[in-house]
Amino acid sequence: MEDIVSEITAQALNQLAERRVEQSSQEFERAIEAVQLSPEEEEMLAAALESEHQEIPVNSQTITVDETTSRFSGAIWYEEIQKQIVTLAGLGGIGGYVGFLLGRLKPQRLIIYDPDRVETVNMSGQLYGQTDVGDYKSSALANMVRNYANYNNIVALNDRFEADSEATDIMICGFDNMAARSTFYEKWKQRVLSYPAGSDNRKKCLFIDGRLAAEEFQVLSIQGDDERAMVEYENKWLFSDAEAEETICSYKQTTFMANMIASVMVNVFVNFIANFCGPIIDRDVPFFISYDASTMFTKVEM
């Protein structure tokens, strides 16, 4: 085939030289057409010309896609999560990992609160490293998320979440004391009640409370339109710090459980958002999830 194409092309070039025509692509093709070819030669020439005149291919869509989310950008909840504003308070064993995982999902904005600085002892169960020691946890986590998730829409506040702090529709906490949980929950509830009963705004509110020990955890989640869950949470789960079960100082936290509870909490958040994206079957957003590492037993209550 190459010999035939070469011969045809040579004939065309000779005709062009004799006629002293300008070497434009259109005149070149007209000269080739003037050559008497057999059907087989015409077919071969057409294939050769097509190969020579291929247009530059259209850029792959992946060129314009954020490569840091490309492995899950096809999820039904992907775009909706990027519209969410999330408040996360308490950046210890629970909050550090939750913040990292949320950063990977890239919500519209992530607001984080914690007044504490990183200490060496935190490395026994929290996400922080040696270079973070001495820094505020909120600043250290923000820098980590920027580095590991290429996510910059994070507001890092080196303060406690107080009664006068601003609430958002979605609030997640990982506190180690009941007083802070109570304040955080009350602010979220006030925001929920500021919306008309039965409104879509209420339905789009979510509260997640994570509680962690060395080898067990509990996750409580309340949707804005679930009054039953609010009552149960207030009556059964907002007890005082004096009533909270004490733990042995050297057996308070492990990294693998901190990582695990964070994954479950973010899973609940993802399921909640997915339910606004028209899933074939609604996803579960359980009120209560508990896990015991010694038996590997998981308990779920809706």
Over which residues does each language-model region extend?
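Glycine-rich phosphate/adenylate-binding loop
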Residues: E2-S60, E80, E166-I170, G174-M302
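Glycine-rich dinucleotide-binding loop and its adjacent helix/turn
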Residues: E55-E79
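Glycine-rich adenosine-cofactor-binding loop
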Residues: Q82-K106, I111-R117
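Conserved active-site and cofactor/substrate-binding residues in soluble primary-metabolism enzymes
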Residues: A89, Y97, V133-Y136, A140, ...
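Conserved beta-strand segments of alpha/beta enzyme cores
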Residues: R109, N153-V155, L206
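Glycine-rich phosphate-binding loop and adjoining beta1-alpha1-beta2 segment
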Residues: I112-N150
